[in-house]
């Protein structure tokens, strides 16, 4: 396998086969780096970040015996994206009112008026 960084990029999740050194991605086939919500669309509590990180570890551990490929990395990213949507729907996560753009990419906020 070449020293090409594998990556998965979704709206709210970025995963790389790399480590971060001096704000640069350095290829490391034995390491996955997770970047959650790079555009700061959501307001995150420490607990909600931990839930996403724990689920990420669970998905990576499940994949551990298989070869890492673009497909498997995209699958992990898609499952994390769905998990973030669930956190938002369950009220454990909210949109960031100070976000650069308010586009409600995962649906309108759930408020009493809309329920």
Swiss-Prot record:
Q: Which family does it belong to?
A: Belongs to the complex I NdhM subunit family.
Q: What is its main location?
A: membrane
Q: Name one GO molecular function term.
A: oxidoreductase activity, acting on NAD(P)H, quinone or similar compound as acceptor
Q: Which reaction does it catalyse?
A: a plastoquinone + NADH + (n+1) H(+)(in) = a plastoquinol + NAD(+) + n H(+)(out); a plastoquinone + NADPH + (n+1) H(+)(in) = a plastoquinol + NADP(+) + n H(+)(out)
Q: What does this protein do?
A: NDH-1 shuttles electrons from an unknown electron donor, via FMN and iron-sulfur (Fe-S) centers, to quinones in the respiratory and/or the photosynthetic chain. The immediate electron acceptor for the enzyme in this species is believed to be plastoquinone. Couples the redox reaction to proton translocation, and thus conserves the redox energy in a proton gradient. Cyanobacterial NDH-1 also plays a role in inorganic carbon-concentration.
Kindly give the Pfam families that the UniProt entry links to this protein: NdhM
Enzyme Commission identifier(s): 7.1.1.-
- Cite the entry's keywords alphabetically: Membrane, NAD, NADP, Plastoquinone, Quinone, Thylakoid, Translocase, Transport
Q: Which residues cross the membrane?
A: none
Per the record's keyword annotation, is NAD included, yes or no?
Answer: yes
The cellular location(s) given in this protein's UniProt record come to: Cellular thylakoid membrane
Q: How does it assemble?
A: NDH-1 can be composed of about 15 different subunits; different subcomplexes with different compositions have been identified which probably have different functions.
**Official protein name in the record:** NAD(P)H-quinone oxidoreductase subunit M
Q: Which InterPro entries match?
A: NdhM
Taxonomic lineage from the root: Bacteria, Bacillati, Cyanobacteriota, Cyanophyceae, Synechococcales
What gene is behind this protein?
A: ndhM
Q: Does the keyword Transferase apply?
A: no
Q: How does it sit in the membrane?
A: Peripheral membrane protein
């Amino acid at each position: 396998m070449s020293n090409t960084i594998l990556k998965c990029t979704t709206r709210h999740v970025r995963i790389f086969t790399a480590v971060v050194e001096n704000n640069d991605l350095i290829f490391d086939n034995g390491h996955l780096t997770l970047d959650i919500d790079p555009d700061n669309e959501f307001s995150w509590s420490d607990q909600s970040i931990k839930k996403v990180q724990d689920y990420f570890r669970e998905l990576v551990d499940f994949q551990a015996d298989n070869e890492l490929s673009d497909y498997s990395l995209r699958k992990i990213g898609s499952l994390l994206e769905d998990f973030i949507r669930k956190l938002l729907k369950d009220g454990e996560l909210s949109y960031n009112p100070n976000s650069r753009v308010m586009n409600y990419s995962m649906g309108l906020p759930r408020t009493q008026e809309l329920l």
